[in-house]
């Protein structure tokens, strides 16, 4: 499924920023359960990060996360603020945890986007994440594509 999503995502990416190559990773133990991740776009630098990470976490859900840091956080923050209502309506949550590598959508890591006062205020990174439940397995590729399109659309302002 992730390989298929990778091709869909490549067709949807229209940003000015070169997205890098898609990467699919898998493992057996994210908090005790197997996982698969697709990163596209995928720009991971020491100071600057731009990634849209789609994760399947066995027994939990699919999630799609926009991960920004450094110059990409500065570039995208005004667009996120301007499109906040639409992102919230699509089910996106904002990262509030201190560990940028925690992906599970739980209260210690994420809050509803419309429940926070200031987006990205004083934080070293910014993450927006939405989930697609396993009860929507058949629809998941389409729904993840729509969520990706919403995030990727911000790259064209």
Where in the sequence are the language-model features?
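Charge-rich, low-complexity N-terminal segments
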Residues: 1-44
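Long, solvent-exposed, polar/charged low-complexity segments
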Residues: 1-10, 107-157
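Soluble extramembrane domains of integral membrane proteins
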Residues: 20, 28, 34-36, 49-50, ...
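Aromatic- and glycine-enriched beta-alpha-beta binding-site module
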Residues: 31-86
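A structural detector for beta-sheet-dominated domains
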Residues: 41, 95-97, 131
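Short, internal acidic amphipathic alpha-helical interface segments
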Residues: 69-120
